[in-house]
Amino acid sequence: MKRTFQPKKRHRARVHGFRKRMSTSNGRKVLARRRQKGRKVLSA
């Protein structure tokens, strides 16, 4: 059986990256919450 996680840098960035988060209002809310919480890394 193959593993379900087959990492790809481009896919990770495009789906969960900073620019993707900034492109929608809800994504910006995600970043705001993570800033408020004090996350060192905001997005992938």
Swiss-Prot record:
<dbReference type="Pfam" id="PF00468">
    <property type="entry name" value="Ribosomal_L34"/>
</dbReference>
<dbReference type="GO" id="GO:0006412">
    <property type="term" value="P:translation"/>
</dbReference>
<feature type="compositionally biased region" description="Basic residues">
    <location>
        <begin position="30"/>
        <end position="44"/>
    </location>
</feature>
<feature type="compositionally biased region" description="Basic residues">
    <location>
        <begin position="1"/>
        <end position="22"/>
    </location>
</feature>
<dbReference type="InterPro" id="IPR020939">
    <property type="entry name" value="Ribosomal_bL34_CS"/>
</dbReference>
<dbReference type="GO" id="GO:0005840">
    <property type="term" value="C:ribosome"/>
</dbReference>
<dbReference type="GO" id="GO:0003735">
    <property type="term" value="F:structural constituent of ribosome"/>
</dbReference>
<keyword id="KW-0689">Ribosomal protein</keyword>
<feature type="region of interest" description="Disordered">
    <location>
        <begin position="1"/>
        <end position="44"/>
    </location>
</feature>
<comment type="similarity">
    <text>Belongs to the bacterial ribosomal protein bL34 family.</text>
</comment>
<keyword id="KW-0687">Ribonucleoprotein</keyword>
<dbReference type="InterPro" id="IPR000271">
    <property type="entry name" value="Ribosomal_bL34"/>
</dbReference>
<dbReference type="GO" id="GO:1990904">
    <property type="term" value="C:ribonucleoprotein complex"/>
</dbReference>
<protein>
    <recommendedName>
        <fullName>Large ribosomal subunit protein bL34</fullName>
    </recommendedName>
</protein>
